[in-house]
Amino acid sequence: MLDIFKAIILGIIEGVTEFLPISSTGHLYLADYIIKLDQPTSFINMFMVVIQLGAILSVIVIYFNKLNPFAPSKSKREKGQTWQIWFKVIAAVLPSIIIGLPLNDWLEENMTSWQVISATLIIYGILFIVLENYYAKRQPSLTDLNKMSNKTALLIGCFQVLSMIPGTSRSGATILGAMLIGSSRYVATEFSFFLAIPTMFGASLLKLVKFFKAGHVFVGNQLAILLVGMVVSFIVAYLSIKFLLKYVQTHDFKPFGWYRIVLGIIVTICGLVFA
C-alpha cells in the first residue's frame, strides 16, 4: 500500500515536470532518493519511463480535434493542414530513431549518474536565460505552426536527440531549439507537445519490450503501482499543459532557467551526501 502512495507522488511529479522544460527525469531521480519504491531496480527503471504514457494521453485528449485529420467538422483545407502537422512530427522524430535509438543502451549505462543530471540541469538552465535575453531584442520569424517547414521540424528533432541525456528535458531541448531557429514561444511549446506523442510512446514501448525480454514479469501489486502512476500523471499533466500554454503567451522561460540551476545544485548536494 505504501508503494501505491509513492506511485501517486511520482505520478504528480511526472505530470508536473514532463511538459515543463525542467526535466522530469531529474525530478524523478531526485525523488527516488527520498521516496524510493520498494521494488526491484528493473521495475523502478521501467516505471520511471513508462509512467509517462499517462502524460502523453493528456496531450492526445487536449489536442484530439486539432490532431485528428478525419474530424468531420474540418474542411478539406483544415484536414490538409492537420496532415501537414503530422508530416512535420514524423520529420522531427526521425533523428531520434536514426541517431538516438542506436545510442539508447549506451546512454542508459553511462549517462544516468547524478553528475550528468546535475550538469545538464544547470547548463540548460543557463542556456534558457541567455536565450531569453537574446530573444527579448528580436521578433520571432515563425508565429504560425502551419507555416513551419519540414526542414525546420527536422532541425527541432535534432535538438530532441540531446534530450536523451538525462536531466536535459525533452520539452526543454525542443523548445530551446525551436526558439533558436526563430519560432515563437507558443509555436515552440505546442510543437514540442505534438512531438512528444510518437517520441514518448516509442520510448515507453522500447522500455517495456526490454523489461519483458529480460525475463521480468509484473508480480504482486506492480501493475497496480504502474497504472496508478500513469493515471495520476495524466490528470496532472493535463493541468500542466493548460498552464504552460497560457503562461507562454505573456511570460518568458527565465524562471524555468533559474529553477533548473537551483535544482541542479540540489541534485549535486544530494549526490554528494547520499551517493
UniProtKB/Swiss-Prot annotation:
It is a multi-pass membrane protein. Its main location: membrane. InterPro entries: UppP. It is an enzyme of class 3 (hydrolase). It catalyses: di-trans,octa-cis-undecaprenyl diphosphate + H2O = di-trans,octa-cis-undecaprenyl phosphate + phosphate + H(+). GO terms for molecular function: undecaprenyl-diphosphatase activity. The chain crosses the membrane at residues 2-22, 43-63, 83-103, 111-131, 161-181, 186-206, 225-245, 255-275. Pfam families: BacA. Keywords: Antibiotic resistance, Cell membrane, Cell shape, Cell wall biogenesis/degradation, Hydrolase, Membrane, Peptidoglycan synthesis, Transmembrane, Transmembrane helix. It comes from the Bacteria. Catalyzes the dephosphorylation of undecaprenyl diphosphate (UPP). Confers resistance to bacitracin. Belongs to the UppP family. Bacitracin is thought to be involved in the inhibition of peptidoglycan synthesis by sequestering undecaprenyl diphosphate, thereby reducing the pool of lipid carrier available. NCBIfam families: PRK00281.1-2 (NF001389), PRK00281.1-4 (NF001390), PRK00281.1-5 (NF001391), undec_PP_bacA (TIGR00753). This is Undecaprenyl-diphosphatase. It comes from Lactobacillus delbrueckii subsp. bulgaricus (strain ATCC 11842 / DSM 20081 / BCRC 10696 / JCM 1002 / NBRC 13953 / NCIMB 11778 / NCTC 12712 / WDCM 00102 / Lb 14). The gene is uppP.
